[in-house]
Regions:
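N-terminal and secondary-structure boundary signal
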Residues: 1-128
Length: 128
């Protein structure tokens, strides 16, 4: 059976919601590499609601830190408007600081994979 979580939250109190989500949906990440991928569509401010809010990213990073992973990587590869402009996109959105030093440019290690689709024969993804 599928489960969802609906929890009242604000960006100021999102840490409680993140903690609750990890309680309801436990993850075994001890000694594993964890990639946290915020949604970075383009350079914008948090108030524009175009990217993952920095306070939410920070809450997730801090929760994952407590779970003893072998490695944490925070990254995305902003598409269309700012494709390949990762560092500037993370800086402008406030996500670089929220990543707490775990940021990695996922656009630096691209690879092409076959993609069985009516629309695309292949797709580019990060090796990370």
């Amino acid at each position: 059976m599928h489960r969802v979580m609906i929890h009242p939250a604000s960006y100021d109190s999102c840490r409680r919601s993140v903690d609750r989500a990890f309680e309801l949906f436990p993850q075994d990440i001890a000694q594993k590499k964890v990639v946290i991928k915020p949604n970075v569509l383009r350079m914008s401010t948090a108030e524009e609601h175009i990217v993952t809010h920095p306070q939410l990213l920070r809450a997730v990073v801090e929760r994952v830190e407590q779970m003893s992973p072998a490695q944490i990587v925070v990254g995305d590869n902003p598409g269309l408007f700012n494709y390949g402009d990762n560092e500037r996109s993370f800086e402008k959105t406030g996500l670089m600081a929220a990543a707490k030093g775990y940021y990695k440019n996922l656009g630096n290690t691209p690879q092409t994979l076959a993609f069985d689709s009516d629309f695309l024969a292949e797709v580019g993804v990060s090796k990370e």
